């Protein structure tokens, strides 16, 4: 396994070559990876449909309501929670500027005033996780907004592991399997989270049958998963 110094050396060389092509977006992604390696961050990213419960799951992990439970109406709507010694919130704007905020309500106010917020970085002191541990909450993969899709893909490539999160009623959507297949091709470890399993009705279909259908679909698409979680409220069934 390469050391951080070796990784940074390769990344800087790659960045230098990419800069020759004037591909600003790819350079930006490489810069994000460089930052992650330099700061020795372990990053877990939640992606999935709108209203799949990604923010709620992140709040559950921290045991605090850090993120609003409904989507933040920002242009790219990505929230980055990093464990640090001190708390703070930074809004990153599309013009490469940023501003420090006192609370998340100010993000909503900025959007009402038509500020173009690309992402929100939250520094949070947590006794549960080591400093540098980062959780990212991305826009819905089913969004038709180009900047939402761009934001999701950008943070996808800076992740150590990706939690693909879906609502119980939308498990069999082809979009899910197409996206997870892409993650496999990018060599990003994937955990499949089927949320709101409390919607399951045992009188309509047994849980074992539902589970078998999920596993069969994954096999048909030839998708490799690190794990599957069936989540309902604060308890989980795991595979």
Annotate the PLM regions.
Residues 1-21:
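Charged, amphipathic alpha-helical linker segments immediately N-terminal to NTP-binding catalytic cores
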Residues 22-23, 206:
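Alpha-helix capping and helix-coil boundary motifs
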Residues 30, 35-239:
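Globular "head" domains of long coiled-coil molecular machines
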């Amino acid at each position: 396994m390469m050391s951080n110094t070796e990784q940074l050396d390769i990344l800087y060389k790659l960045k230098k070559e990419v800069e020759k092509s004037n591909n600003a977006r790819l350079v930006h992604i490489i810069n994000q990876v460089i930052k992650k390696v330099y700061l020795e961050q372990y990053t877990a990213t939640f992606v999935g449909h709108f209203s799949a419960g990604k923010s709620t799951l992140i709040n559950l992990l921290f045991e605090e309501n850090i993120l609003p439970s409904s989507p933040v109406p920002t242009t790219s709507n990505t929230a980055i929670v990093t464990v640090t010694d001190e708390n703070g919130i930074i809004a990153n704007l599309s013009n490469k500027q940023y501003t420090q905020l006192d609370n998340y309500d100010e993000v909503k106010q900025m959007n009402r005033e038509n500020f173009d917020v690309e992402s929100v970085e939250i520094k949070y002191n947590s006794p549960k996780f080591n400093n540098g541990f980062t959780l990212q909450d991305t826009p819905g993969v089913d969004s038709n907004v180009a900047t939402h899709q761009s934001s999701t893909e950008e943070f996808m490539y800076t992740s150590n592991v990706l939690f693909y999160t879906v609502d119980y009623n939308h498990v069999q959507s082809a979009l899910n399997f197409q996206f997870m297949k892409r993650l496999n091709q990018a060599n990003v470890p994937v955990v499949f989270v089927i949320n709101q399993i409390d919607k399951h009705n045992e009188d309509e279909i047994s849980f074992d049958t539902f589970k078998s259908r999920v596993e069969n679909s994954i096999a048909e698409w030839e998708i490799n998963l690190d794990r599957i979680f069936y989540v309902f409220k604060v308890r989980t069934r795991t595979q």
